[in-house]
């Protein structure tokens, strides 16, 4: 009530105040600091006054101020509840662009909320992926560190072993190496034996071939001897039957 008494309503001030182009073009006065209640009051009733002035068509608003006029939310809600809200808006001198801009504002609000939720989900997913990646890296580093420590522990244990255990370890390693060497030597020995067997078989084959040649040559010489033996006998018989001819031949041969 105190606020209403101190500041009377300004809804009908335009009826008594004559606005001219020179007064409208004049520069605004100095900025006065007002209280919070006064600002709310001025914003509400100033919006109503400006709307009434605009409806009265006393003057034309500049484009910049026409676009930034405050909107009376109570009037807008009341008119939306009516069936002919578009007609009412047109009757008051407001264009359809007002309704279109309001719808766009609502859509932008929902779009921003959806975008914010999607961004929130994306950021949450990226943070979870980064967290999981960090866990995997940490586990890998722990595994590598544990492997390095295990190798160091094995080396220390080998250096700190007592003499008997060290000798047993060396004996086992030598036995494993000898087994590997024995396997290699066994393969080498088997290859050598197979080579000797092959060479022996070839030598036997060649020996049999030589024996066959000798036997064939002996057989041929025996056959030749058998053929020549009767001829030699025939010659002896002829010589014995003609002793003079043999003497003449012997004499002629001596003279020569």
Curated annotation (Swiss-Prot):
Disulphide-bonded residues: none
Source organism (scientific name): Arabidopsis thaliana
Record-linked InterPro entries: ATG8-IP-1/2
Annotated membrane topology: Single-pass membrane protein
Protein name per the record: ATG8-interacting protein 1
Note: Plants over-expressing ATI1 display increased ability of seed germination in presence of exogenous abscisic acid (ABA). Plants silencing ATI1 and ATI2 display decreased ability of seed germination in presence of exogenous ABA.
Induction record: By salt stress.
Transmembrane segments: 181-200
Protein's cellular compartments: Endoplasmic reticulum membrane; Membrane; Plastid, Chloroplast membrane
Main location: endoplasmic reticulum
Gene name of this polypeptide: ATI1
């Amino acid at each position: 009530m105190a606020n209403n008494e101190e500041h009377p309503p300004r809804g009908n001030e335009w009826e008594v105040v004559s606005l001219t182009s020179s007064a409208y073009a004049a520069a605004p006065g100095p900025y006065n600091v007002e209280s919070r209640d006064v600002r709310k009051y001025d914003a509400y009733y100033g919006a109503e006054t400006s709307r009434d002035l605009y409806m009265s068509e006393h003057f034309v608003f500049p484009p910049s101020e026409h676009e930034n006029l405050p909107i009376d939310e109570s009037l807008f809600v009341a008119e939306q509840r009516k069936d002919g809200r578009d007609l009412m808006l047109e009757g008051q001198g407001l264009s359809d662009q007002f309704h279109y801009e309001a719808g766009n504002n609502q859509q932008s609000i929902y779009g921003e909320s959806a975008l914010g939720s999607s961004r929130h989900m994306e950021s949450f997913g990226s943070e979870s992926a980064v967290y999981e990646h960090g866990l995997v890296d940490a586990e890998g580093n722990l595994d590598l560190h544990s492997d390095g420590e295990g190798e160091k522990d094995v080396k220390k244990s080998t250096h700190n072993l007592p003499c008997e255990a060290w000798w047993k370890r060396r004996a086992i390693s030598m036995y494993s190496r000898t087994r590997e060497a024995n396997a290699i030597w066994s393969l080498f020995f088997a290859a050598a034996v197979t080579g000797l067997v092959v060479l022996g078989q070839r030598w036997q084959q060649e020996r049999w071939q030589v024996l066959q040649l000798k036997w064939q040559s002996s057989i041929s010489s025996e056959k030749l001897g058998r053929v020549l033996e009767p001829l030699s006998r025939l010659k002896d018989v002829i010589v014995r039957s003609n002793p003079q001819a043999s003497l003449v031949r012997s004499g002629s041969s001596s003279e020569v």
